[in-house]
Design a protein with these regions (language model features):
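Terminal alpha-helical segments
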Residues: 1-143
Length: 143
């Protein structure tokens, strides 16, 4: 089995914590009917999950397009992560971009509600993958 350095493991754990926080914020803002904000938080949850896996391979990218492209190349095209995740990424990126930059863009609860389950499933899949790939990996520090 492979081992992550303590530094990389700490970075990955931080990315997972950020993803978890974004997912919680997405749920909270959804309940408040702030659907654009909720969609943005869902996207960023997925973004942090992608960065966590890339960090395991020693890759640090900040630009969204680079992260998405490299994630697809390394994990989706190689079938490590299911190809349906590519659609999830595209849809959330598109909604987040329109929510942030388009005038008069509207989004409803029905538009984003399905993405919660998919994002939570991806979170669980990536955590399980990390535990399988790296024998010293733990989600929580010190475990």
């Amino acid at each position: 089995m492979n081992r992550l350095s303590e530094q990389i493991e700490a970075i990955v754990r931080d990315r997972l914590a950020n993803a978890k926080e974004c997912l919680a914020a997405a749920k909270d803002t959804f309940q408040l009917k702030y659907y654009k904000t909720s969609a943005g938080r869902l996207y960023y949850a997925v973004f942090h999950l992608m960065r966590a896996l890339l960090n395991c391979d020693g890759i640090e990218m900040k630009h969204h397009s680079g992260v998405i492209s490299e994630f697809r190349k390394r994990y989706i095209k190689t079938q490590i992560i299911d190809s349906s995740v590519s659609d999830l990424i595209s849809q959330l990126y598109d909604i987040r971009s329109k929510s942030d930059y388009s005038v008069f863009y509207e989004i409803s609860a029905e538009d984003i509600e399905p993405f919660f389950e998919e994002t939570e499933a991806l979170f669980q899949e990536i955590e399980a993958l990390l535990k399988t790939m790296y024998d010293n990996f733990s989600v929580e520090k010190g475990q």
